């Protein structure tokens, strides 16, 4: 149970990083360059809205934006299961580490999955500002520099 809770917390924290980056990038950009908000009734997924904002803010090309969209789709899927769980139980699934049948969410929130999602968040904490400094709009450069400087100790710890 401690691994389940810790994994869930790490995954939600990773999603919160992307939410904070979304909000910070909206603060930096002029209104004409902002991605549309969800309030337009489009029903767009949160991961797609965040992807579009980060694409515009950090100057991502379509291929890199596609990679980010794929990662964010998974991050938000895991986050949504933790924050907005279904009240119904589905069929039991085999836990990848314990080898026993468990409720689906118990199999989702493992150390391995948390590690992958945290590493993805840290990778994008480095990738996005690095690209932003080189090819992003000038309004994002201060935020990009701050992210690279503030997170440098984390990069060193996770890249070894």
Question: What is each model feature region?
Answer:
Residues 1-45, 130-134, 138-141, 145:
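Amphipathic alpha-helical interface elements
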Residues 1-12, 66-73, 104-111:
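Short, solvent-exposed segments of well-ordered alpha helices
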Residues 20-100, 111-124:
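Flexible secondary-structure boundary motifs
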Residues 71, 87-160:
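Polyanionic, low-complexity intrinsically disordered segments
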């Amino acid at each position: 149970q401690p691994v389940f809770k810790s994994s869930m917390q790490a995954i939600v924290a990773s999603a919160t990083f992307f939410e904070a980056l979304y909000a910070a990038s909206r603060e930096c950009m002029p209104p004409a360059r902002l991605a549309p908000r969800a309030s337009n009734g489009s029903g767009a997924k949160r991961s797609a809205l965040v992807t579009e904002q980060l694409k515009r803010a950090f100057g991502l090309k379509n291929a890199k934006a596609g990679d980010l969209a794929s990662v964010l789709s998974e991050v938000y899927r895991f986050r949504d299961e933790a924050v907005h769980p279904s009240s119904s139980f589905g069929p039991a699934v085999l836990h990848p580490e314990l080898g026993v049948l468990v409720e689906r969410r118990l199999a989702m929130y493992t150390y391995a999955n948390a590690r992958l999602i945290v590493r993805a968040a840290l990778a994008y904490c480095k990738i996005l500002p690095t690209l932003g400094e080189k090819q992003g709009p000038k309004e994002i450069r201060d935020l990009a520099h701050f992210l690279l400087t503030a997170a440098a100790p984390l990069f060193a710890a996770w890249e070894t």
